Amino acid sequence: MKIWHISDTHTYHDLLTIPNGIDLVIHSGDCSNPRDPYNNEPEVRDFIDWYKELPIKNKIYVAGNHDTSIEKRLVTKKDFEDNGIIYLENEYVTIDGIKIFGSPHTPQFGQWAFMKERTKLERLWRLAIHEPCDIIVVHGPPKGCLDKSYDRNNNMESCGDKSLLNLVLDMQPVYMLFGHIHNCKDIINAGMLKLSGYDTWFSNGSVVTDGKFGKLTSNGNILEI
C-alpha cells in the first residue's frame, strides 16, 4: 500500500501536487485557520469539497488544533463520512489489513481545539491507543521527533509530547504520523525520521513554513507498507 501523508495545509490544499499511484491519503490536521468556530467552518467545508474529489480510493482525516469547528461539532464525523472520508477521533480503522489509529489531541498551548494539559495526555494515550496497530496518526509530534521550534525568547525548544513518544516506542508501529510543528526559520521539521534502535518511522507531513504562509514548502511524505 502506498500512502501520501500531508498535514497543516491551512487552506492552501489546492496548491498541492497530487502524486500518482496512491492507495491512501492521510491528513493529520489543521486544514483551516480561524480560532472562531463559526469563521472556521467554511474553511473546513471547503477542504472537504477538495479532499473528496482526490483520485485516491481511501482518505483519512484527523483534526488539528486549528480545526475549531470540528471540536464544536459544527462540522461532524458524518459530514466527512458522507463525502467518502474516514474521520478518526480516538479510534481505529482497518483498511486492506492495515490497522490505523487517529487522535486530534495536542499539549495545551493557548486556547485552541483538542488541547489537553500534558499531565492528562499520558492517561489519554494509554486508554485510547490500547491495541497494537500499524500506523498511529496524531496531530502533534512525540518529543524529540521533528518537533523543533523557537520559544518567545528565541531559544530553540523541542515541542513534542514525551508521553506519546514513550507509548510509540513501547508499541513500535510501522509509522507514526503527525504535523502541528511546521518548518520555522532555519529549522526543517517536515520529512521523516527513524530513531536508532527502533523500527518506527516518524513522519511530519506539514506543508507550510511559519512566516511564509501563502505558499507550500513541502508536498508531504510518501510511505509504503
Predicted regions and their residues:
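Active-site neighborhood of phospho(di)ester-bond hydrolases with catalytic His/Asp-centered motifs
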Residues: H5-S7, V25-D30, K59-N65, Y87-N90, ...
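Short, conserved loop/helix-junction motifs that constitute active-site signature segments
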Residues: I18-N20, Y51-I56, D79-D82, I129-E131, ...
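Binuclear metal-dependent hydrolase catalytic cores centered on His/Asp/Glu-rich metal-binding motifs
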Residues: I98-I135, N153-N166
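Short glycine-/acidic-enriched loop or helix-start segments at secondary-structure transitions
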Residues: L15-L16, D36-Y38, E71-R73, K99, ...
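Core catalytic region of metal-dependent phosphoesterases/phosphodiesterases
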Residues: I6-I95
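Binuclear metal-dependent phosphoesterase catalytic core
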Residues: Y92-D96, N166-M171, Y175, H182-I225
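Acidic, histidine-bearing metal-coordination/catalytic regions of metal-dependent phosphoesterases
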Residues: M1-H13, S218, E224-I225
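Active-site-proximal segments of metal-dependent phosphoesterases and phosphodiesterases across multiple
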Residues: S32, D36-V44, P132-Q172
